[in-house]
């Protein structure tokens, strides 16, 4: 059994539940009557559950004596009163308080023994017929299966908390998978990654140097690199990282990697003297994107009915406005190729160019599609052009998943209906979404990509905009002249100063100010005060003001700031309902954000809304286009959004942006992050933090290289 002390007691209260793991803190009353706080990872117990807990006693500096649990399992009660309470708690499907009372009245302290070993006797109790008995027997058997599998896990020093998930996925084969195919769990079961599967595999006797383990470790390292933005990885770097993770000899890793390549589970590509390793999915996506881009770029100039130069002259005259040379070039070239890139910083006239291109395309009678990666970016595109615009996801039509990858209604077999598509905020496009978008374009459709190449790269894998520009195989128009100097003039000026490595010019009371503080706790409270003040100045519009922080942790991180700001602008009130999910307390009126794409609900990563109703285990959120109900595990998709990370803000604009720059976030402070944060603001930027952090953010350039061969594939000749 699991080593350490064994205690038992009854759960009195759940004190804490982590939002992103199964870490719990709860209080039990030991069998000797003493109260004790238990900490550990496991299946959440119910109030009133009797538990047997393995672990050891600890002393917490703040909270005193605690019991650090390595595992726990539910004990069946052995008194009539305990059994009735246990059954009435909902432990078994189909048994409520009334039936629990009848069962205990019939069988007394023997109730649990009879239920587990002689379930056919339950027919003696009023209200239990053949159908009810069948359902109860199935529920009882499921409980026995969980307990037996949990015991099997614990005999190998693994917490029994995984038992329910394993049985739900594998049924009778769960024990076989544990002993013979443990790494299947990585792809089959949410919440079990390589590290957990590896610990279980080794406990059940997997050879540490065996092919199955090393192969799983190699794939894990590749997937981890994908989450850091890489599409592929040089083989030497992959071998080195895998050897460190697996504590194995590099020569053994290399042998297994070669075997994996031979079987086709991974793909190798030689380029410029290096060998790059891909997952099959990433390799095929990069090939498709390269082919689609080349095919688009190869389209010949559209034969227009309108003289473009005359059209531009007329368009300018009607608006009493003259395009700059590069702006005019962008409009002139917009229909020359099947694919055109228009890039430039804030205030360089990208929106004006897009308006002119739309007017030209409409004059030609073209069917135009407008889209952007996020809801707020699409909304802004619609507002500035006075045309319909959608997120890329909504344009394509979500149709579920294959594994972790999205499916869409529109694809190569069912293309979109359009002659010209304009995609804004393209710096946010990762390889996967680019692939889905390009394959949904009809053969005659032309594409214009608009974005700022100096902003943060996409959260997902790839560097699509950079790679297209770097390939020099697609027409690119760079807008460099700054026009927008009246509204947001200092913001635009400072954005360009920052982008070129210069310190921003600050105006203490104006549109770009810097409030210096070296105390991060005081700084956090200052940010909360500033947020409240700025929101009040707008008449209470919580969506016009946004706090941006580079990281989630520490006093000035997103998590702590959200709690502070919520307390200040939407504090506890008898008139407001509350719901706690994990470590996050929600109230009606809270500003919240969707954290991941949910194709079934039709809400996507970064969408913001307001909580307008809360239940015991449910939340209703009002988004600009719809109301969505969240329940149970779905609540984990939602977070408070008074403060968000800079990455989450991409594609959005706010009247006022409050940016936190503190020393504890130094690892994240880079020029493109600050540049992206500043360019989110339309009217006002408030920097809060230290001069040292500001200087670091301005001077530090992002030296990390994303491994991708898209640019080389577009050039063709550099792939060996």
Predicted regions and their residues:
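Accessory, non-ATPase domains that flank or precede helicase/AAA+ motor cores in DNA-metabolism machines
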Residues: 1-307
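Loop/turn positions that initiate beta-strands
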Residues: 48-50, 589, 606
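Short basic/glycine-enriched coil/helix segment immediately N-terminal to the Walker B
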Residues: 405-419, 430, 438-445, 649
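Conserved helicase motor core of P-loop NTPases
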Residues: 453-601
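C-terminal accessory regions
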Residues: 500, 607-720
């Amino acid at each position: 059994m699991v080593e350490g002390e064994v205690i038992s007691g009854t759960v009195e209260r759940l004190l804490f539940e982590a939002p992103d793991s199964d870490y719990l803190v709860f209080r039990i009353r030991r069998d000797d009557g003493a109260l004790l706080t238990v900490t550990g990872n496991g299946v959440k117990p119910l109030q009133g559950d009797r538990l047997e807990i393995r672990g050891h006693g600890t002393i917490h500096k703040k909270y005193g004596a605690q019991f650090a649990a390595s595992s726990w399992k539910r004990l069946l009660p052995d008194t009539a009163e305990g059994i009735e309470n246990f059954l009435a708690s909902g432990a078994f499907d189909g048994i409520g308080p009334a039936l629990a009372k009848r069962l205990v009245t019939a069988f007394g302290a023997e109730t649990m023994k009879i239920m587990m070993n002689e379930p056919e006797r339950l027919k003696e109790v009023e209200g239990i017929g053949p159908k009810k008995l069948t359902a109860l027997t199935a529920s009882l058997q499921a409980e026995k299966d969980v307990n037996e599998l949990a015991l099997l896990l614990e005999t190998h020093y693994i917490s029994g908390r995984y038992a329910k998930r394993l049985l739900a996925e594998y049924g009778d084969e769960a024990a076989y998978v544990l002993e013979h195919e443990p790494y299947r769990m990585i792809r089959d079961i949410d919440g079990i990654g390589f590290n957990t599967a590896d610990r279980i595999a080794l406990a059940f006797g997997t050879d540490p140097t065996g092919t199955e383990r090393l192969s799983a470790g190699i794939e894990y390292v590749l997937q981890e690199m994908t989450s850091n933005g890489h599409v592929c990885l040089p083989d030497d770097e992959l071998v080195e990282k895998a050897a460190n993770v697996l504590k194995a000899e590099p020569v053994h890793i290399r042998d297994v990697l070669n075997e994996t390549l031979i079987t086709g589970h991974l793909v190798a590509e030689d380029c410029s003297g290096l060998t790059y390793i891909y997952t099959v999915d990433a390799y095929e996506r990069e090939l498709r994107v390269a082919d689609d881009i080349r095919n688009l770029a190869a389209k010949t100039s559209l034969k227009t009915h309108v003289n473009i130069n005359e059209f531009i002259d007329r368009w300018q005259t009607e608006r009493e406005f003259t395009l700059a040379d590069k702006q005019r070039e962008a409009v002139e070239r917009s229909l020359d190729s099947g694919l055109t890139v228009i890039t430039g910083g804030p205030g360089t006239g990208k929106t004006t160019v897009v308006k002119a291109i739309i007017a030209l395309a409409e004059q030609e009678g073209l069917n135009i599609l407008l889209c952007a990666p996020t809801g707020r970016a699409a909304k802004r595109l619609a507002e500035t052009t006075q045309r319909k615009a959608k997120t890329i996801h909504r344009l394509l039509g979500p149709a579920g998943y294959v594994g972790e990858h999205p499916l869409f209604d529109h694809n190569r077999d069912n293309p979109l209906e359009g002659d010209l598509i304009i995609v804004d905020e393209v710096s946010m496009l990762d390889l996967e979404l680019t692939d889905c978008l390009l394959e949904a374009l009809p053969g005659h459709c032309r594409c214009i990509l608009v974005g700022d190449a100096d902003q943060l790269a996409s959260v997902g894998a790839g560097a699509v905009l950079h790679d297209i520009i770097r390939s020099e195989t697609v027409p690119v128009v760079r807008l460099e002249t700054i026009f927008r100097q009246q509204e947001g003039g200092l913001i635009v000026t400072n954005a360009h100063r920052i982008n070129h490595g210069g310190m921003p010019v600050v105006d203490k009371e104006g549109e770009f100010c810097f409030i210096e503080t070296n105390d991060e706790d005081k700084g956090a409270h200052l940010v909360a005060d500033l947020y409240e003040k700025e929101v009040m100045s707008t008449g209470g519009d919580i969506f016009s003001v946004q706090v941006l922080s580079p990281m989630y942790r520490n006093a000035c991180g997103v998590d702590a700031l959200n709690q502070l700001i919520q307390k200040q602008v939407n504090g506890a009130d008898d008139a407001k309902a509350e719901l706690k999910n994990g470590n996050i307390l929600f109230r009606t009126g809270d500003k919240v954000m969707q954290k991941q794409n949910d194709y079934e609900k039709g809400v996507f990563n970064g969408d913001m809304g307001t909580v307008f109703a809360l239940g015991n285990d449910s939340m209703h959120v009002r988004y600009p286009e719809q109301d969505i109900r969240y329940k149970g595990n779905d609540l984990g998709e939602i977070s408070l959004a008074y403060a968000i990370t800079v990455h989450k803000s991409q594609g959005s604009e706010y009247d006022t942006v409050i940016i936190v720059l503190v020393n504890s976030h130094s690892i994240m402070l880079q020029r493109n992050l600050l540049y992206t944060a500043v360019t989110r603001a339309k009217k006002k930027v408030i920097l809060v933090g230290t001069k040292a952090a500001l200087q670091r953010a301005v001077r530090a350039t992002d030296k990390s290289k994303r491994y991708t061969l898209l640019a080389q594939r577009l050039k063709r000749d550099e792939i060996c």
